[in-house]
Structures are given as C-alpha cells and as structure tokens.
C-alpha cells in the first residue's frame, strides 16, 4: 500500500515506516509542522517525500491522520475526503490535554474513520463516543542491549521540562537529585537546574542528541527515571527498557502496564521510588538483573514485529468495518468537532 502521513511524531514514525509498505511524507521548502518530510532521518528507501500540491490523488491508497485539521486539508488539496472516498485511520498519540475525564475526542461519534490509541490508558481517558476505537501499542526498533550502568547516576529523557513543569514531573527532580546526580536528555533542557532549584553539580543537561548517541550515553547511567505525571507512554521509557536499563517510574497513565515489578519500581509513593533508586545506584549487580527483566518485558510487549503486524491487519481491514457502511459511507460528522455536533 501507498500510505500518506505527515511526520508529526518522529519516534513513532521511525517504527511505523519500517513496515512493508510505501510511505508518502509531505514536504515543504520551509519544513515545519506541515512539511517536515524525512527531516534527514535514516529511514528506508520506501519512505518518500512528496509535494502534496502536485501529488496524484489516485496514488494514495490510505492515510494515517494525526491531527483533525488534516481531514479538511486533504479534501482541499487532493479532492478526496478521508473516511468518504479515501481510506483513513486516525492515530491519537496523546492523553487529553484538559477536561479529563470528560474530554471528548474530536472524532467521537463517527464511524467512518477508526480511532487508534497508542495505549489502553489513552483509550480509557478519552471519551470516544460511538467511534470505533482500538489500541495498537507502541513498537520499538531494538537498539540492542547497550546497558553498561557504569555511571552511578540517574538518566531522564524529557522534552521541554521547564515549560511543561508538573506534567512531566519536573518538580520531582530535586528529590531524585538528592539520591544521585541526574543526566537529563531532551529538547530545551537548558536552564533546568536553575528552574528546578537543583545544584548544577547534581544535574547535567545533555540536550537533544541524535538517536544512536542518545542510546549509547543513556545506557551508561545506572538507572532510568520516569517521573511523568500526565503524558502518554513515553517512547523514551520503552527505549530505555530495550537498552536493558532498570526503571524507577511514577505509577501514572500506562506505566504500570509497561514496567513489570521485577524491572525496578513503579509506584505513586515518591519515597518508595527514591529508596529503590538509591538501592539500585548502590548495587550495580541488582541494577543489571532488573535491567535484563526490563528488556525482556519490552521485547515481548513492544517489539517492532508485533506492532507492524497489528497495523497491517488494520490497514487491510479499512473499508470493511463490521456493521458499518464501509469507506464509502458518507458520514459528514467527521468534519465537525464533537462539541459542535447536533445529535442525529
């Protein structure tokens, strides 16, 4: 199949484009949210950059939507409407940003476009109405068992921790820094120590490293810390588990499902997490054993093959929704935000 999708979430796309299809990524001269293309990523040759304005509409077999605005954009540019005469699936990456537990998904109550969540918690958190909703859990290209744990430090991967604050558990970092020095990787981590009130000697901002370098450097840390309060399941957590790192994670959203007890600690009790982090930093052998358990669990649940197989099944089924009108059913409710619809 020739599948059109925008490059919205780099890590997720990195897994998705390793399937057996041809992937069409819109590109614009200035890049940006609507034209990032490959963005220099080392992806297979089956990933092609396309100019949407000149793309042959009939060359697209299906589209993976990731933003509500893409529906109207494709109808305008291609002359084919997702869910009407263009097979489509909507991928929701995130938890609701506000209004939980009453947050209505923009595609709630339509049947033409399946709504895919990346975690079971996300599916539960959103009000999907009568939309066909399902879960396809993340898949991770295996980076290999790179863990050395040579540094008695805690590794954290988080983007924009200063701006996002409590959402990403930034306020919890001082407590972890009291246990062991922190290495923080991710976008816009400069100034984090000052913003969080942590001594510079206890926190090193590593910045946004390339994937291979990130994996290598992160794997040198003794323990991976996942302090996120309200985010979807971070792919960085799953990558750390694939690397063979033991995990200390806040028991929020999907973390309790992803991290088994033998991999470290998952708890809403911060003191319990701090005790576990301190013990693992002081005991390299235990840290390594728990890291092996983390890797085994991640390979079993979040392996790339299982992820791609699930997507193949869904893409093959587009247009044959049981009890529905198929891809030719003209459900105009997909064009109207849930909060503005009139009940039929």
Question: Which positions does each model-derived feature cover?
Answer:
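Conserved acidic donor-binding segment of nucleotide-sugar-dependent glycosyltransferases
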Residues: 261-271, 279-284
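Aromatic "clamp/platform" in nucleotide-sugar-dependent glycosyltransferases that forms part
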Residues: 229
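A short hydrophobic beta-strand element within the catalytic core of glycosyltransferases
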Residues: 224-225
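Short alpha-helical segment that forms part of, or immediately flanks, the ligand-binding pocket
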Residues: 215, 238-242, 253-257
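Short hydrophobic beta-strand element within catalytic cores of glycosyltransferases
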Residues: 246-249
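Extended catalytic core of nucleotide-activated donor transferases of GT-like folds
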Residues: 9-12, 21-112, 121-124
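A charged, aromatic-enriched C-terminal amphipathic alpha-helix characteristic of glycosyltransferases
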Residues: 282-316, 320, 329-334, 343-344
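Conserved catalytic-core segment of nucleotide-activated headgroup transferases in glycan assembly
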Residues: 125, 141-198, 205
């Amino acid at each position: 199949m020739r599948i059109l999708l925008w490059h919205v979430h780099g890590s997720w796309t990195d897994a998705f484009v390793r399937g057996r299809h041809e992937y069409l990524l819109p590109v614009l001269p200035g890049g940006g949210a609507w034209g990032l293309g490959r963005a220099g990523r080392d992806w297979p040759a089956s990933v092609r950059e396309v100019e949407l304005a000149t793309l042959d509409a009939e060359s697209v077999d299906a589209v993976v939507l990731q933003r509500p605005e893409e529906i109207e954009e494709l109808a305008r540019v291609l002359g084919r409407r997702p869910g009407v005469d263009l097979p489509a699936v909507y991928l929701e990456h995130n938890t609701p940003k506000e209004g939980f537990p009453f947050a209505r998904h923009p595609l709630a109550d339509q049947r033409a476009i399946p709504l895919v969540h990346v975690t079971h918690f996300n599916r539960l958190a959103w009000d999907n109405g009568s939309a066909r909703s399902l879960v396809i859990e993340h898949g991770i290209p295996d980076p290999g068992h790179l863990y050395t744990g040579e540094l008695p430090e805690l590794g954290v991967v988080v983007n924009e921790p200063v701006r996002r604050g409590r959402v990403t558990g930034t306020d919890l970092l001082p407590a972890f820094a009291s246990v062991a020095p922190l290495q923080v990787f991710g976008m816009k981590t400069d100034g984090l120590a000052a913003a969080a009130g942590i001594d510079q000697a206890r926190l090193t901002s590593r910045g946004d490293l390339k994937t291979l370098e990130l994996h290598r450097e992160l794997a040198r840390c003794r323990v991976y810390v996942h302090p996120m309060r309200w985010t979807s399941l971070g792919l960085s957590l799953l990558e750390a588990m694939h690397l063979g790192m033991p995990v200390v994670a806040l028991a929020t959203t999907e973390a309790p499902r992803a991290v088994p007890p033998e991999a470290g600690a998952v708890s809403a009790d911060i003191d319990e997490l701090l005790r576990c982090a301190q013990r693992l930093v002081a005991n390299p052998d235990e840290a390594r054993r728990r890291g092996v358990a983390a890797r085994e669990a991640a390979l079993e649940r979040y392996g790339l093959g299982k992820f791609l197989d699930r997507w193949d099944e869904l893409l093959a089924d587009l247009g044959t929704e049981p009890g529905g009108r198929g891809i030719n059913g003209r459900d105009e409710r997909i064009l109207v935000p849930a909060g503005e619809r009139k009940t039929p």
